[in-house]
Amino acid sequence: MVRLLALFLIVGVLTVKAEVEREFILVSGGPSLHEWEKFKAEPHDRWWGNFIRSARVRIQEIQAKSGPGTKITWLVHKPSYLRRASRQDKQDLIANIVSVRDKYGVNLVWFEEGDELIEYLNAGQPRDRVKIANFEYYGHSNRACWMFDYSNEIDSGSKSWLHENELARIHRDIF
């Protein structure tokens, strides 16, 4: 009888722990290319890692405050970094990003389109047991959308974005 009671107690504790698991989500959009920016009065993104470094610094802050085992998922717009690497920087930017993942032990998820970001938010983890504690975006934006590849493939524009009208597709109960 005592063993059965202990078993129920252990199962109950594990169930409670599973219900309160939290995930921090960081998103890094991509850098622009100099070939588009060089004609502007105020070009930006001279360094490829602006949005990568910002996320890395935040990862360090979260781990310092919440502990090294904290669940952190980092979504990165891969096409932008592949394009920047091949057309401008001539170095393996993907390996640099992966090295951040490896050093800090975070879950790195590559994405190409806003739909993939929404899909991860809604179903990337079992959302009945893993709730999103915090969500942060590092990248280009305007008042209506996040532009994951702004001035990366086309000048002053984006082919990959998440518009405010699409936010309704994010399930409310994931937070």
Regions found by a protein language model. Give the residues of each.
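Sec-dependent N-terminal signal peptides
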Residues: 4-12
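Short catalytic helix/loop segments, enriched in acidic residues and glycine
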Residues: 46-61
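N-terminal beta-strand/alpha-helix entry module and adjacent surface
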Residues: 40
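Catalytic-core segments of thiol-dependent peptidases
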Residues: 30-31, 36, 44, 61-175
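A beta-strand/beta-hairpin structural motif
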Residues: 26-28
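Sec/Tat signal peptide C-region and signal peptidase I cleavage site
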Residues: 14-19
